[in-house]
Amino acid sequence: MREFRGYLSLQRGLSPHTVAAYTDDVKKLLDYLLDEHVQLRDVTYEMLENFAAALYDLGIAVASRKRVLCGIKTFFRFLRTSGFIEHDPARLLQTPHLGRTLPDVLSVEEIDMLIGAIDPSTAEAERNHAIIETLYGCGLRVSELINLEITRVSFDDEYIIVNGKGNKERMVPVSRVALDNIAAYLHGSRGMVPEKPGAANILFLNRRGNRLSRQMVFIMIKRLAEAAGIRKRISPHTLRHSFA
C-alpha cells in the first residue's frame, strides 16, 4: 500500500486528500477479500463484480460506489504496470452511471425458472431453494441472509428477525412458501452437515458447516440464472428488488 500511495502522490500528482480517499477505498476491497479468504494475486474479474454488487447491497450511494470502483481500477492498473501481478482483473470492470437507472427485476415466471434450474440431486438443492424463496419473499440484503439465525425464524407468526444496517434489528414478514422451504431444509440436508463452532445457530451453512459468504450466494444465483437461460444481470439484490 505504501508503494501505491507513493505512485498516487508522486507520479499522478494527487492531493493528500485524494490519496487518502483512494487508499481508504482500496482497503474496503482488501477487507472484503480477507473475509472471503482470497489472496490479492488470486482475484478475478468475477470476484470484483461480486464486490461491486456487495457495495450495492450495503446501500452505498451510486457516487460513492463509482469512486470506490475507480480507485480499485487504478490500484490494479498500478499493480499490473509495477509487475506485482501478471493480469489486471479490473480492466473490464464497469463503474455505475450517475444518472438514474432502474435495477433489473425478475418476473414471477423468471423466479420459477431460477428455482427450476436447481438440480434436486445435489446436497445443496434444499438450501438453495430456501435461499431464493427467502431473498425473494422477504426482500433481504445478502448480508442479512447469511447471518440469519435459526432461532430468529418464527414459523407460527410468519416473521424473521434480522440484523440490518447499523446492526439494528428489524422484524420482517416472511411468506409461507419461504417458511415451508426453510422447514424442509432444516429437517433435511441442514441436519447432515457438521456444525462448526460459532455457526450452530446460523440457518444457511456450506457443506463444511460454516456460514455462507456473500460470494458463495452471488455465484450460486449467477450459475442458476445461466442454467435457466436468464440473460439479465442477476445477483442477490436482483431478488431483493423483485420482492413485492
PLM region spans:
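Conserved catalytic core of the tyrosine transesterase superfamily
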Residues: M1-A244
